[in-house]
């Protein structure tokens, strides 16, 4: 009797869709109010002047201008600001 036993199951075989996180507008780029600057989980980047933080920690511009990255404070946090041109 030619029988083949059932193959064992595997724990692999699935993958989640990427969330497309990261910096969307880089230093020196000109942006419009409402443009998304960074998509992030947590606050790797903190909002500086003319930048606000959304409920999912996304940083977005509140004014038209040029993107500026800087590090400030005791712990050298990274801030993103908009310099009005």
Curated annotation (Swiss-Prot):
A GO molecular function for this record? structural constituent of ribosome
Cysteines paired by S-S bonds = none
Spell out the InterPro entries in the cross-references: Ribosomal_bL27, Ribosomal_bL27_CS
* Any single biological process term in GO: translation
Entry keyword annotation includes rRNA-binding: no
Where in this chain does the entry annotate a coiled-coil region?
A: none
Q: Which family does it belong to?
A: Belongs to the bacterial ribosomal protein bL27 family.
Which PANTHER family does the protein's record reference?
A: LARGE RIBOSOMAL SUBUNIT PROTEIN BL27M (PTHR15893:SF0), RIBOSOMAL PROTEIN L27 (PTHR15893)
NCBIfam families attached to this UniProt entry: L27 (TIGR00062)
The protein depicted here goes by the name: Large ribosomal subunit protein bL27
Gene source species: Vesicomyosocius okutanii subsp. Calyptogena okutanii (strain HA)
Q: What is the lineage of its organism?
A: Bacteria, Pseudomonadati, Pseudomonadota, Gammaproteobacteria, Candidatus Pseudothioglobaceae
Protein encoded by which gene: rpmA
């Amino acid at each position: 009797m030619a029988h083949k036993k059932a193959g064992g199951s595997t724990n692999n075989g699935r993958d989640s869709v990427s969330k497309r996180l990261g910096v969307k507008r880089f230093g020196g780029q000109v942006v419009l109010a409402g443009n998304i600057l960074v998509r992030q989980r947590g606050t790797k980047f903190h909002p500086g002047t003319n930048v606000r933080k959304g409920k999912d920690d996304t940083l977005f511009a509140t004014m038209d201008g040029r993107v500026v990255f800087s590090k400030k404070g005791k712990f050298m946090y990274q801030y993103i600001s908009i310099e009005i041109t």
